[in-house]
Amino acid sequence: MKILLSNDDGVHALGIKVLFDELVKHFSVNVVAPDRNCSGASNSLTLLNPLRAEHLDNGFISVNGTPTDSVHLGSSQLFTDCDLVVAGINKGANLGDDTLYSGTVAAATEGRHMGMPAVAVSLAGNNEQHYQTAAIVTAKIIKRLRTHPLPADQILNINVPDIPLAELKGIKVTRLGHRHQAERMQKMQDPWQRDIYWYGVLGQELDGGEGTDFHAIANGYASVTPLTVDMTAHRSIENIKSWLTALNLSD
């Protein structure tokens, strides 16, 4: 199996190096990742400037773009025979609503858009000490994907608690939880007394009960959430039809 490995923390981040070292024991792995930290980049693209790929001494390829750019360039030009896209290991969790903003999840999503199964993996914790735990869990899951391939419209979002492997209780298949709204943006001033603004702290869990990714992590389990690329709210189609078809555009 040939893997295209990317991330959103940047090509020099510890997480991608640890994951590469584990995956390369079992698979052929090529790394194409942003040249800088792109956390929160979501599915953004670089459209107004050309992309450049720089080959680094360790064999990784650095791209002056976003995580989505990196996967698109890697799979369409640099390594066109890849079988799987893996994104991570992200520094910090991607739980619940985080997935909407995550460059890690976006990199995996782009892999699916390019016709490949894809996996996003994040280390859930504040200390970032046990990347190896997440790397080993990811490698084991990928091995199972050989015989249990993902449906064409799905990716796997993996979150692993920041604990030693021996303390990990297991793996749970979960749904996304939800957060409370983030705190208000913080207004400050720069040295020239001009107003600047910083995003507030993420909201705490609003829906973090049993069965959610939040609950799994809080109880010492790795969380695996299948995500669909189709954002259609299928359950609402008939209801909206019922009142929208009566709309008279000539009124």
Swiss-Prot record:
Catalytic activity: a ribonucleoside 5'-phosphate + H2O = a ribonucleoside + phosphate
EC number of this enzyme: 3.1.3.5
Record Gene3D superfamilies: Survival protein SurE-like phosphatase/nucleotidase
GO cellular component: cytoplasm
Domain of life: Bacteria
Binding of a divalent metal cation, residues: 8-9, 39, 90
Predominant place of localization: cytoplasm
InterPro entries xref list: SurE, SurE-like_Pase/nucleotidase, SurE-like_sf
Pfam families: SurE
Single Gene Ontology MF annotation: nucleotide binding
Subcellular localization: Cytoplasm
UniProt-listed SUPFAM superfamilies: SurE-like
Cofactor(s), by name: a divalent metal cation
Keywords: Cytoplasm, Hydrolase, Metal-binding, Nucleotide-binding
Cofactor notes: Binds 1 divalent metal cation per subunit.
Function: Nucleotidase that shows phosphatase activity on nucleoside 5'-monophosphates.
Annotated family: Belongs to the SurE nucleotidase family.
Stored NCBIfam families: PRK00346.1-3, PRK00346.1-4, surE
Listed name of the protein: 5'-nucleotidase SurE
Organism, scientific name: Colwellia psychrerythraea (strain 34H / ATCC BAA-681) (Vibrio psychroerythus)
Organism classification: Bacteria, Pseudomonadati, Pseudomonadota, Gammaproteobacteria, Alteromonadales
Protein encoded by which gene: surE
